[in-house]
C-alpha cells in the first residue's frame, strides 16, 4: 500500500498523512473497468513496533474504503502482516510467512478468490515485494511515476 497507492511518508496510519500518488484514482478505475480484482497486501511493521495498533490500521482502511466507494472504487480484499522479528509488542514479534517477502498473504488471496494467475500482477516499492511476487509466480513492477500510466503499460504487456 504505502509507496504504491499512497506516498510513503513513514508509518502512515492517520488520515491526515494519507496522500494518494499521482494517477491512483484513475488507475484503479481503469483496473475495475477492465474487470480486474484489486487486492492490497501490506506489511504493517508499525503495529509490531508499537507505533500504532491494528485498530488504527483498520480505521484508516475504513476511511479509505468510504472515500473510494464514493468514486465506485473498491478493493476486493486487504491482507496485512502486523509482524516484525524486531517488534516491541511481544505478540507481533516474530518471523512470519505473512510478512513479505513471504507470500502467505498472496496464497490466502489465491485460496479465497478465483483468479487468473496468468493475468495477475503485483506492484510494489521494495525488494521484499518483488521477492514475494517471484515466489508467487506473479509479474512484478516497481512502483514509479504516474500510477495510471504504469497500469496501462502493465496491461499492454500482460
Give the residues covered by each predicted segment.
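Short, active-site-adjacent cap segments at secondary-structure transitions
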Residues: 5-6, 46-49, 85-87, 129-130
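Hydrophobic residues in well-ordered beta-strands that form the structural core
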Residues: 7, 40-42, 142
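Active-site neighborhood of HAD-like aspartate-dependent phosphohydrolases
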Residues: 1-37
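Active-site flanking residues adjacent to catalytic metal/cofactor-binding acidic residues
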Residues: 1, 42, 124-125
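Asp-based, Mg2+/Mn2+-dependent phosphohydrolase catalytic module
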Residues: 55-58, 62-76, 88-122, 126-158
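Substrate-recognition element of Asp-dependent hydrolases with the DxDx(T/V) motif
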Residues: 24, 28-64, 74-84
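Short, solvent-exposed loop/turn segments at secondary-structure boundaries
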Residues: 16-17, 50-55, 93
Amino acid at each position: 500500500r504505502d509507496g504504491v497507492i499512497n506516498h510513503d511518508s513513514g508509518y502512515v496510519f492517520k488520515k491526515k498523512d494519507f496522500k494518494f500518488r499521482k494517477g491512483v484514482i484513475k488507475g484503479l478505475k481503469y483496473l475495475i473497468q477492465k474487470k480486474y480484482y484489486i487486492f492490497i497486501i501490506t506489511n504493517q511493521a508499525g503495529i509490531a513496533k508499537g507505533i500504532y495498533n491494528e485498530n488504527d490500521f483498520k480505521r484508516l482502511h475504513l476511511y479509505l474504503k468510504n472515500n473510494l466507494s464514493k468514486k465506485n472504487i473498491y478493493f476486493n480484499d486487504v491482507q496485512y502482516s502486523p509482524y516484525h522479528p524486531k517488534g516491541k509488542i511481544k505478540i507481533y514479534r516474530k518471523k512470519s510467512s505473512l510478512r513479505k517477502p513471504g507470500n502467505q498473504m498472496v496464497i490466502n488471496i489465491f485460496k479465497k478468490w478465483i483468479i487468473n494467475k496468468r493475468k495477475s500482477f503485483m506492484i510494489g516499492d521494495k525488494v521484499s515485494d518483488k521477492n514475494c511476487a517471484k515466489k508467487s509466480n506473479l509479474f512484478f513492477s516497481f512502483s514509479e511515476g504516474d500510477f495510471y500510466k504504469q497500469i496501462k503499460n502493465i496491461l499492454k504487456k500482460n
